């Protein structure tokens, strides 16, 4: 788990007041900004290390000025007055950070009840397209080679709309 994800999870805990922690948006903001900074550094380092990236390849990690420009962008700045909006902002940045971890991003979508970014002009289309996904389908080989357990687990269907056992 990258440091950015740890910071985003801590930001959520402080924003929502989870696990016996008193809600504190100031501390949530500190963790949120540390998560964004960690994400920017991680993905920039990935670009630097990439043998494929040759055009406009970053020469180094983002400067403090560049990071502050991102953190001070009105769209990115954590809302210090509204815990619900702040939590959605945390989820959005965590989702962006998970760009190369689609399974984790999908889990975040499910864990947050669909509060990850979506096109606001097509929210209904997003929900009708992706909102019924509860799990990945088992590969056909699972049914072929493990029919008894597959049947017990799925009830004989292999639909993405079927809930996983922990969500039933």
Task: Please provide the spans of the model-predicted regions.
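Acidic/polar-rich alpha-helix caps and helix-coil junctions
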Residues: 1-168
